[in-house]
Amino acid sequence: IAAPLNQSVAVLIGYCALATPPLLILKSQLDGLDQRLLPAGGWLQWRVSPWWTALFQGGRAWLMVMPPVVLTGWLMSRFIGDQGGSNPLLEMVLNGSDPLALFLLAITAVVLAPLFEETVFRGVLLPVLGRSFGRGWSVFGSALVFAVAHLSIGELLPLLVLGLGLALLRLSSGRLLPCVVMHALWNGVTFLN
């Protein structure tokens, strides 16, 4: 297997291997809850129907949050310089000519990452923080953990702004699917850029 394809396969398998255990633990925890006490749509509120409203809500929120995220990124680069943050593997694959490697990396970034990260940050962390600290602090706290989890100093503030938008979308829509759509749009545009 060529180097870019080999590394794209490794990223896809590695991401799935890292995401599966916490999701299985979460499932076992949720299975033990009294179903009568759960909010409409379940604790994670994974209501897909109607899917077109999720697409609309996610797309609209993405359009609303994109200007402040881009502005924050521009200000960061203007005042502290380019701190990097771009994934070196992504650059290697994008500079290569293997369409399968590019496709596998796109699936990881645009489908798997938004599904997993929204389940963790907006599906679990946001409501847990909300119960302990209130809505405002839960929005900020989940956004901060989301930004820090990406391990990129140069992208910390733009990711914090993105996380704030995702958390507010989750609270306003009452569903996770619009957040996944918004996150996928963000990752997709970032991937293409």
Give the role of each language-model region:
Residues 17-29, 176:
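Hydrophobic cores of alpha-helical transmembrane segments in multi-pass inner/ER membrane proteins
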Residues 22-27, 69-73, 113, 117, ...:
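Alpha-helical transmembrane segments of polytopic integral membrane proteins
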Residues 25-29, 67, 71-75, 148, ...:
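Hydrophobic membrane-targeting alpha-helices
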Residues 36, 53-54, 63, 67, ...:
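Membrane-interface helix/loop boundary segments of multi-pass membrane proteins
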Residues 132, 136-193:
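Functionally important transmembrane alpha-helices
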